[in-house]
Structure formats: C-alpha cells, structure tokens
Swiss-Prot record:
Entry function: Acts as a guanine nucleotide exchange factor (GEF) for RhoA and RhoB GTPases.
Listed name of the protein: Rho guanine nucleotide exchange factor 3
Modification type Phosphoserine: residues: 47, 70
Occurrences of domain PH (ranges): 291-449
Protein encoded by which gene: ARHGEF3
C-alpha cells in the first residue's frame, strides 16, 4: 500500500584518510629495475568523474527522530537502490553514510559551558541543531544540483524539460535557508551562545509557504524519475553516482526528498528549543507563535499535496468503456491510500481508495507512461462490504477453506464485496504481510465510517465493516444480507501492498476528517 514516505538516513563517521610518506633518511633506490610495461596516460582515460564538478563530500545530518510522511509524499521514500549490474565494479557492501553529528558543547569553549546550567546547555544544543541542520540542508541541495542536475543536462542524459519536472523549484529553496542560517549566525555571540531565536523564526517561517509548489510536484517527479531509470544511460549515471563518495550511498531521490523531510521536522525542533526555554524568558512567547505558524504551513502544504497526488492518479486512470466512469472518482479530492495487491490467482492489481469509491486497476504502459486500467466497475465506499479473512480461508485459484498441499496456508487476505441490483463483485485481496493488511482494513473502515457519517446515518461499523444499528443492536449488511451470498466471479483477486505507502496513507487519513490519509503517495503528503 502506498504510504508517504519519509526516507531513512543512516550515518557513519567519515574516515580520515592520510598518506604517510616514508622518511627521507637513507639513500634513494638507485638500482630500480627498468620496467618495459607500457602505461596508458591518465589524460587519455575518459571518466565520468571529470564531468562532475567538485562537490564537498559531507554526509546527511542525523535526524534525532524518524519521521514518516504521506504527500508522497508515498516518498515513497525508501532508498531506491539499483541492483548491481554484471558489468559494474564489485564494490564492497556498505551502509548508507551520514555526516558526523556536531554538538554545541563540543564546538565551542568548554569553560563557557561550565558556567551554564544543564537546562541552558540543552537549549543551546537545540538551537545549534537547528542552525547546523540548515547548513547541512543547503549543502545537500547544492550537491543535488551540481552533481546530478548539471551533469545530466550537460551530457544530454535527460532533457531540460525532464530535469525541470524532476527537480522542480529546488533552486529557489536554497536562498530561503541561506537567509535563516545567516540570521542565526548573526545573533550568535562570540562565545557561541544564542540568547533569542524566537523573533527570527516568527519572521522567517512564513516564507516556507513557497514549499507548496515543490511538495505538490513530488508525485509527478518521482514517477518520471522511476520511468527514466529504465533508460540505460540514466541508470548507469545514477549508479555511478551512488558508488561515488560524494553521494554517501544515497540515491538521487533521497536528496530530492530532503526539503520535505526538513519541513516536517521544524515543529519537532522548535518544540525541543521551547522545552528547554525558561518560563520567564521572552523567547518563550515567540517560540509558541513560531510553532503555530509552522504547524499551519505544514497542514496546508499537506492538504495541497494530497490534492495534487489525487489529481495525478485520476488523470492516469484508463477506462475500457464509458460505463466504468464514475462521478465519485471525478469529485474526489483526497486519495486515502493506494498500493499493489494480488488476487487469488496471483494477478497483481493496483488498488486506489478515494474518498467515496474503491477502484481496482491493473498497471499498464500507455504512451510510454505508467497508467492504471480499470479492472472492474468502481465500488462505492458506502455500499462496500469488508471482511477480514482468516489465514488459510482462501486458496489460490479461488477455493474457500480448501485443503492445501503440504498443509500450506495462504495468509493476509481480506475481501471486499459489492452488490447493487444485477451488479455484483467480490474480490479476495492479499497483502504482502500482516501489517499491510491491517493498514488496508483500517483505511477502508475509516473511509466508510466517514462516508456514512456524512450521509447522516447514525451507527457504527463492526470489525468486518458491517453497519450496526444502535437502536436494535442488530447487524445490517449494506447492499446484501450475507457476504457469502455474493457472486464470486473471476473478479476475485488477492493483493499485496507496499507497507511504507500504506502507513503514510493512513497517517494522512487520521489527519483529515473527510478521508483516510494516503501517506506516499492515500499517503501523507508531506
């Protein structure tokens, strides 16, 4: 299931590599044996590294807390490491690197630190982390442009239009953070301490509204980047960069997703500073105001990003016939969740849960673009029946509770059904693990409850998605009395989901009263 992604950054300390020259004592080797080997001049060796401008190889700042997201973003943000190619060098496996963590107390005069209380030292550490994070962010954004964008444009690996789509407004973000870093350095005293940061943040944070366009573009940017990776030249270039020291084992998308990750971290950073700020400090009021500002900005960008993601996927739905088109899809503004599932025949399906309709599709390529062809008629959420199937209750091929060879049990299935007059559908869908299955169940139940509440129907949903009448206490199945009475046509299907995307989707769902949050994309947008 698609959840919004937030990338994980691992860190290792950068090794100090020094070359020790042998002592000059003793006579030089005069009796060197002559060598008849022909050495190829280095100048004749063409290297991709010569085309990449020099960049400072400093790792990503370690985040104090792991952050999850749903814009995308689904970010989807697990590192998309390319599989090693048979013709590439066999590099020793190594973990993702990040830059060394710098502490305020270790950077500035220890004698001064000893004059401060423990709480004040923690406050200075939090302020320094904010400042250091800005410096690292600026460095990484510049690296993304110099080491990826510019060389790919110069070598015509991608067109300027494609690069503009993938990198979006990244260039415009650099001056914003340079301005904050400059102001934070200006108010830092010679001893390294900072007295007030609240007024600076209150004045600077509103400019983060410009993140709107960058975050809203991430879904389309990620899709285009994934598509371009099928090009051998693009794949080769990105793999070489991944193996180079400057990348710190991070792929291009990690760098492109850094601004979003930084944006959602600001509330945490400011709360940490506020937590160590005394009540009588004038900075406290300004910090509280700054937290309210950034929370409002993040919420607004998250909403707009979700709408952008919803539009993106709606535009890529392919209808086999006019009858498949549904006004509920057209009116949807939020994608609660989506992801790949399998049916009981092992067919991979891509399922979308919009605000009021569930759409089951197959991923296809159309005009060199990844699109989603409707597999069956869209199912209105208000009429959808949901059933959590026990492990072993569904057999591959469609049999229910059948005997399995070698007592093999098929796991992580759930069923969605719908019947309206002569129309009926039943789909057995399989998630790739228990967590993904539960995320799908939660998202569907939340979406149905929201739709029923909006329709003014009092009552609650039970664990299987059936409607309970609070007056009689009886169970009422929407659209049909028994789930088992439904026709089990060849639309029966099992699905497997993308975990990261699902968790983000549900995150977004919990944050929005009107729908489930589709976190990576249904993912939490930011």
């Amino acid at each position: 299931m698609v959840a919004k992604d937030y990338p994980f950054y691992l860190t290792v300390k950068r090794a100090n590599c020094s070359l020790e020259l042998p002592p000059a004592s003793g006579p030089a080797k005069d009796a060197e044996e002559p060598s008849n080997k022909r050495v190829k001049p280095l100048s004749r060796v063409t290297s991709l590294a010569n085309l990449i401008p020099p960049v400072k190889a400093t790792p990503l700042k370690r985040f104090s807390q792991t952050l999850q997201r749903s814009i995308s973003f689904r970010s989807e943000s697990r590192p998309d490491i390319l599989a090693p190619r048979p013709w590439s060098r066999n590099a020793a496996p190594s973990s993702t690197k990040r830059r060394d963590s710098k502490l305020w107390s270790e950077t500035f005069d220890v004698c001064v630190n000893q004059m401060l209380t423990s709480k004040e030292i923690k406050r200075q550490e939090a302020i320094f982390e904010l400042s250091q994070g800005e410096e690292d962010l600026i460095e990484d954004l510049k690296l993304a442009k110099k080491a990826y964008h510019d060389p790919m444009l110069k070598l015509s690996i991608m067109t300027e239009q494609e690069l503009n789509q993938i990198f979006g407004t990244l260039d415009s973000l650099i001056p914003l953070h340079e301005e904050l870093l400059s102001q934070l350095r200006d108010v830092r005293k010679p001893d390294g301490s900072t007295e007030h940061v609240g007024p600076i943040l209150v004045g600077w944070l509103p400019c983060l509204s410009s993140y709107d366009s960058y975050c809203s573009n991430q879904v389309a940017a990620k899709a285009l980047l994934d598509h371009k990776k099928q090009d051998h030249r693009v794949q080769d270039f990105l793999q070489r960069c991944l193996e180079s020291p400057f990348s710190r084992k991070l792929d291009l998308w990690n760098f492109l997703d850094i601004p979003r990750s930084r944006l959602v971290k600001y509330p945490l950073l400011l709360r940490e500073i506020l937590r160590h700020t005394p009540n009588d400090n004038p900075d406290q009021q300004h910090l509280e105001e700054a937290i309210n500002i950034i929370q409002g900005i993040v919420a607004e960008i998250n909403t707009k990003t979700g709408e952008s993601e919803c539009r993106y996927y709606k535009e890529r739905l392919l209808y086999l016939e006019e009858g498949q088109k549904d006004s509920l899809i057209d009116s949807s503004r939020v994608l609660c969740c989506h992801g790949e599932l399998k049916n009981n025949r092992g067919v991979k399906l891509h399922v979308f849960l919009f605000q009021e309709v569930l759409v089951i599709t197959r991923a296809v390529t159309h005009n060199e673009q990844l699109c989603y062809q409707l597999y069956r008629q869209p199912i209105p959420v208000k009429d959808l029946l949901l059933e959590d199937l026990q492990d072993g209750e569904v057999r591959l091929g469609g049999s229910l509770r059948g005997a399995f060879s070698n007592n093999e049990r098929i796991k992580n299935f759930f069923r969605v059904s719908f019947k309206n007059g002569s129309q009926s559908q039943t789909h057995s869908l399989q998630a790739n693990d228990t967590f993904n299955k539960q995320q799908w169940l939660n998202c569907i139940r939340q979406a149905k409850e929201t739709v029923l509440c909006a329709a003014g129907q009092a009552g609650v949903l039970d664990s299987e998605g059936s409607f309970l009448n609070p007056t009689t206490g009886s169970r009422e199945l929407q659209g049909e009395t028994k789930l088992e009475q439904m026709d089990q046509s060849d639309s029966e299907s099992d699905c497997s989901m993308d975990t990261s995307e699902v968790s983000l989707d549900c995150e977004h769902m919990e944050q929005t009263d009107s729908s489930c949050g589709n976190s990576r994309h249904g993912e939490s947008n930011v």
